[in-house]
Amino acid sequence: MTSILGISAFYHDSAACIVINGKIVAAAQEERFTRIKHDLSYPKNAINFVLKFANLNLSDLDYIVFFEKPFLKFERLLETYLAFAPKGFFQFTKAMPVWLSEKLFQKNALINHLKNHDKNFKDDKKLFFSEHHLSHAASAFFPSPFEEAVVLTADGVGEGATT
């Protein structure tokens, strides 16, 4: 049995999902528990819900996957700011302190949240970061009945891996 916890957090609409052997077993958005629309916090309640539904603990999981790669997203932001300089300088000066102090090093924050969540969770090698649009595509493809498929993703932001 392969068990995967998917986590989306720290942007908007934080959520958690459990996939076991390629089947979505449970999924929940944090806002359903906190009653905060578009909640961006670490989805502790959603994770508790999906783990309880699947009868698992964090330490039982094979993999934990975060929905994006912060360094790729940071690179895209830098490229965008440079491409439109000097027009975006004010936004750049507002965004960079937050990125340099919090967002860029989300791996450490996630590991701390996971360890606080489950004192038995010790294996941070289970934590992986997926490319943003690959996360979207995987969420459509892997639960589908198809062995091969073309998946189109379209949303407002990502790491810039689209054309």
PLM feature spans:
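Short acidic/glycine-rich loops and adjacent helix/strand connectors
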Residues: 1-163
